[in-house]
């Protein structure tokens, strides 16, 4: 049951009928839960039960899309042999499947659960190596496709030029989501506006869903979505951070409890046409549980209220 393979069209039809809930953060939650600064992707090989435990917590919270623990599993971010990076990717997908199967066996649940092969933007100086990045993303996607992945999430991207070869390679083989990260003013680290990012993603026929994750908290993401138009023919995603981190004893931590505020803003975002909601850095299974209990997941024709951009104060 945990290894059900879905077609691209099956996933699209399901989400068009009823809004759906992603999981929350993996990296920040893993670091806090196990009090470690170790790259969480290493746990796929070194501590697989920890990985499955977090996946199960999100399933119990009500998530129907699990992202694999592979966000930074690439040769630029991980200082391990390339063959181990490949195994990290494979294990990431397998562990999520095992977690779903174990959860089904324990609970008797039969609802559809989608496992998204998670690929994050490769940061830093590597971003200047466009050809090398494109090859890396293609290699990562090939490994996931060999493992039978039917759902991809490219997230926290500031642009998508280097992604296009991989996206075109996947084509009709899997459901494709691309999520961008912008700041509170609606611009990515590449200097592109949220509007331009959605426009470019909207022009790629292979992409099924577009949206935003990370970068900002729920209030700023809501304000950004208010002044944007949903790309025609695309599903819309929103996965903000819990808020903004603070430096505590040398670590960037998300402090305080703002779950109620987070859920309230997410309710407003789904009313704007968001089809796929969830959380990024700082969110936990508790956030997702509250979302599952309070969001209206019915799907209906969307009419977006447009807010005027805020005027700059003198």
Named regions from a protein language model:
Residues 1-314:
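Domain-level signal for soluble alpha/beta catalytic cores
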């Amino acid at each position: 049951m945990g290894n059900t393979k879905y077609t691209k069209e099956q996933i699209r039809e399901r989400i068009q009928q009823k809004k759906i809930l992603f999981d929350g953060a993996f990296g920040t939650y893993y670091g806090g839960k196990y009090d470690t600064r170790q790259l969480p992707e290493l746990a796929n090989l070194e501590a697989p039960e920890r990985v499955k435990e977090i996946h199960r917590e999100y399933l119990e919270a009500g998530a129907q899309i699990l992202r694999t623990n592979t966000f930074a599993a690439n040769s630029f971010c991980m200082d391990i042999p390339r063959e181990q990076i490949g195994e990290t990717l494979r294990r990431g997908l397998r562990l999520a499947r095992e977690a779903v199967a174990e959860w089904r066996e324990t609970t008797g649940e039969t609802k559809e659960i989608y496992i998204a092969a998670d690929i994050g933007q490769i940061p830093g100086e590597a971003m200047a190596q466009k050809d090398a990045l494109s090859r890396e993303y293609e290699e990562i996607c090939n490994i996931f496709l060999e493992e039978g992945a039917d759902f991809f999430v490219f997230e926290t991207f500031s642009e998508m030029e280097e992604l296009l070869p991989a996206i075109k390679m996947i084509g009709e083989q899997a459901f494709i989501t691309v999520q961008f990260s912008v700041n509170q003013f609606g611009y990515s680290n590449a200097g592109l506006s949220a509007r331009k990012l959605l426009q470019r993603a909207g022009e790629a026929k292979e992409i099924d869903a577009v949206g935003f994750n990370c970068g900002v908290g729920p209030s700023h993401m809501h304000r950004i979505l208010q002044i944007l138009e949903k790309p025609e023919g695309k599903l819309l995603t929103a996965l903000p951070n819990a808020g903004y981190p603070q430096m505590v004893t040398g670590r960037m931590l998300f402090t305080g409890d703002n779950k109620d505020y987070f859920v309230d803003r997410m309710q407003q975002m789904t009313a704007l046409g968001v089809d796929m909601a969830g959380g990024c850095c700082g969110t936990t299974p508790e956030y997702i549980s509250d979302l599952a209990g309070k969001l209206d997941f019915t799907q209906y024709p969307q009419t977006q209220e447009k807010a005027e951009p805020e005027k700059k104060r003198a």
